[in-house]
Amino acid sequence: MEHFNKTPIIIPLILCCVIGISACNNHKTANNASDSSSAGKKARELVSKMSLEQKVAQLHGAAPAMEMTDEAVAKLFEEAKKDPSLLLMPRRVDSIDSLKIPAMRFVNGPSGVGTGDNHPQDAATALPSPIALAATWDVDAAQQFGKIQGSETILLNYMVMQAPSMNIARVPQGGRVFEAFGEDPFLTSKIAVYNIMGIQGEGAMAVAKHFAANNQETNRLSVDEIIDERTLREIYLPAFEAAVKQGKVAAVMSAYNKINGVFSSENNYLLNDILKGEWGFKGFVYSDFGATHSTVASALGGLDLEMPNGLYYGDSLLTAVKSGKVKESVIDEMLIRRYAAMYEFGFFDKNKKIAGKIPAKENGALSREIAEKSIVLLKNENGLLPLQKGNIKTFAVIGDQIDKAAAGGGGSSHVVPLYTVTPIQGLKNKFGASVAFSTSDGKNVAEAVAMAKKADIAIVMLNLFTTEGMDNEIVFSKAQNDLVEKVAAANPKTVVVIKTGSSVLLPWIDKVPALIEAWYPGEEDGNVVASILVGEVNPSGKLPLSFPKQLKDLPANTKEQFPGVSNVARYSEGIFVGYRHFDKNKIAPLFPFGHGLSYTTFEYKNPKVSKKGTENGTAYEEALTVELDVTNTGNVAGAEVVQLYLALPSTTALPQAPVKLAGFKRVELKPGETKRVSIPVEARSLSYWDIKTKSWKRVAGEINILVGSSSRNIHANLKFS
């Protein structure tokens, strides 16, 4: 008999969003589950054998039915900061043994196998947070990340890995920014695409979430987001489109919020017209937990499964079918979509390998490698880093989390790690007994300052914990900021390591010589950060979102924009999100999108652009190719992320961002080594959404192609007409 938490279930959400490219030999897909496919035929045959009551019983989750409110959700997640088990509940669709239909079990997963149907929660590999994965700018790392997610999903007896989230970081204050891939739709699409490949290549279903524009936690159950069509198409939908067209993603999760007055789970335009119609999605759509608000409107609007309960798709749906408000053929199609995916992934096969032991050591090592690639060196005056082991005899390590790994953010993505390596443990692993360590939690500032004065090196670690269920101020506490300033004044060799889930204000930036953004590195936290500090790993991470100097510099800087007035949030900034806004308004960010330093230097030479494909190629067809030589001009090996931006012709009638990301390539180079780097530019990147024709249209005129190491650090400029 299953036991589960009896605390009133104010159901959290199950985040999910995923994208993919069809490139793994064993990469499973769901978009071929049509009537003509084997899986589709089997699904249709199965549904033909079911009674109406059996059909309806399969259209909702097994949790008790209940309503949710914004206030109750906020309270739940506040309490869950201390006790994540409060988020546990049934996360499955029950089996029908007489028809040999297995239970479909779901698990949260942006940072690894998180909260699921098992109680107590299973331990799993605590991967670096997805925002850290985005900071790698490495599609191979994204695929490996997905392989760990997918394999552990199967090993822990689940079918559906609810990951990754692909909502754009419109506001850095968003409580779930750490679960997704930053502020740019192109970077988000590419990282998510390969993440899906990894998940589905291991036999688990991936989920594209949260469809669409789930960009804030404040009033998330009811907020109405007013978004113009061009902005929706160019900023908030591209990653989902790629999930369907390239990734053949198994499922899509509908979001909590309304878009232009209509809840996502009953939004016929989003779910039927765009997702299933225009994009040809053949998988199934299910609601985020508690995101269903109607029976008939949702059934006709494209929602195939209500989770986690049957508040609207239980008895109410049965009544609606019997009364003729919803045709039985409509619910047949709902089931066929989900069963076809289950057949495609082999979940009706009794011989499919399910359940087993997680290889903790091997997966932990892979998690560490990904996290090491994600670390961003933001500042490094006078080459303070890497630390030279032979020159250091005393260390002062200061911070209230130095004895605890930053394994992840809060909410339904919470992972119970198989093990953790603390920051202080990681440093001791590198330096051993040859260095004397003094530690302080920083609460006694005078003690911390005295300690720092005596040390050869002072390291201050600041954590800013963010969680689903509430938005956050992107500031450290006054006590934390004061601590940094006083320690830095006491020791000119002070290194600050910040661990955040988003960008953050840094009022003391001019007073510290070295700064590292480590995000939430996962279970290997201590080893990851230490390996960067001592130079065993050369930092190569790049920011997936801009760091502002002050809050008023952000794109959504009015109450009408965020969090909204009277539950309405107006996206009046349009397409000018993140660095697009900073560039358009000539605002200098503290650190620009794409920024990240290295312990070596790189030189860009001999750029060349050539035309490929046709004038009006399909969205992902290569239209241009840019090539250039990149040389490591330093004396240590390193990796550079070469970034390609486009400046499209802009007019008053059709404003364009000053630059937008259209390609990138991570390249590893030995000292003195040169490699010819080739970056494709897709046809979609040369296009805009034409609101008159309701279609993508190629821009006319001269295009500037800029290649550099960040959106503000350009090393090569080409023109193309």
Show the residue positions of the predicted features:
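Bacterial N-terminal signal peptides that target proteins for export
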Residues: 2-11
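Bacterial N-terminal signal peptides
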Residues: 12-20
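Glycoside hydrolase catalytic-domain context in secreted enzymes
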Residues: 20-689, 695-697, 702-711, 719
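Conserved glycine-rich phosphate/nucleotide-binding loop
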Residues: 714
